[in-house]
Amino acid sequence: MSFAEKITGLLARPNQQDPIGPEQPWYLKYGSRLLGIVAAFFAILFGLWNVFSILTLNVSCLVAGIIQMVAGFVVMLLEAPCCFVCFEQVNVIADKVDSKPLYFRAGLYIAMAIPPIILCFGLASLFGSGLILGTGVVYGMMALGKKASADDMRAAAQQTFGGNTPAQTNDRAGIVNNAQPFSFTGAVGTDSNV
């Protein structure tokens, strides 16, 4: 058993279908899940740190810390439902979100990560929610899909709109017909030398 198979076996849930699809590489599928788990852990940890800002009577950082901790728990619930074995409905919720398109998860993570950063801009909220934001960006990139092959992009670039005439690739083809080249030999005869 290779190292990659061991890692994928650790991160896969039992009886899990492949919601992302076979077109994504294994390191992107499981790397995004691992990034989400790490992001959730640090969001909970730094959210707790922000909650302790109540000692300095900073209410906005208290609210940001609570939101960040809730976001961390939601991300942990969706990425690693095995951490919440005491709740019966966790697998149902995680399976429901897994059945949705990837851009749904990306939007959810990005929307949960932005308010703590806005409410209390500091290293704790920036790092904790920034990791969740990064996880949302990775899921968004996975939702966009992979880039087309070079031949497909070349064919799309050579298509012309409005006819079957091929595009001009001549070096002398210009935007303006009968345009004269620039000349730096002297001043124009009507120049007033002002």
Swiss-Prot record:
Channel activity is inhibited by La(3+), which reduces Ca(2+) influx and thus inhibits it's function in promoting activity-dependent bulk endocytosis (ADBE) in response to high stimuli. It comes from the Eukaryota. The record marks E79 as: Calcium ion selectivity. It is a multi-pass membrane protein. One of its GO terms (cellular component) is cell projection. The chain crosses the membrane at residues 34-54, 59-79, 107-127. Keywords: Calcium, Calcium channel, Calcium transport, Cell membrane, Cell projection, Cytoplasmic vesicle, Endocytosis, Endosome, Ion channel, Ion transport, Membrane, Synapse, Transmembrane, Transmembrane helix, Transport. Pfam families: Cg6151-P. One of its GO terms (molecular function) is calcium channel activity. It is found in: Cell membrane; Cytoplasmic vesicle, Secretory vesicle, Synaptic vesicle membrane; Presynaptic cell membrane; Endosome. GO terms for biological process: bulk synaptic vesicle endocytosis; cell competition in a multicellular organism; clathrin-dependent synaptic vesicle endocytosis; photoreceptor cell differentiation; positive regulation of neuron apoptotic process; positive regulation of presynaptic cytosolic calcium concentration; synaptic vesicle endocytosis. Its main location: membrane. Transmembrane protein which mediates synaptic endocytosis, fitness-based cell culling, neuronal culling, morphogen gradient scaling, and calcium transport. Regulates synaptic endocytosis and hence couples exo- with endocytosis. Controls two major modes of synaptic vesicle (SV) endocytosis in the synaptic boutons of neuromuscular junctions (NMJs); Ca(2+) channel-independent Clathrin-mediated endocytosis (CME) in response to mild stimulation, and Ca(2+) channel-dependent activity-dependent bulk endocytosis (ADBE) in response to strong stimulation. Homomultimer. Associates with the dally/ magu complex. Belongs to the calcium channel flower family. This is Calcium channel flower. It comes from Drosophila erecta. The gene is flower.
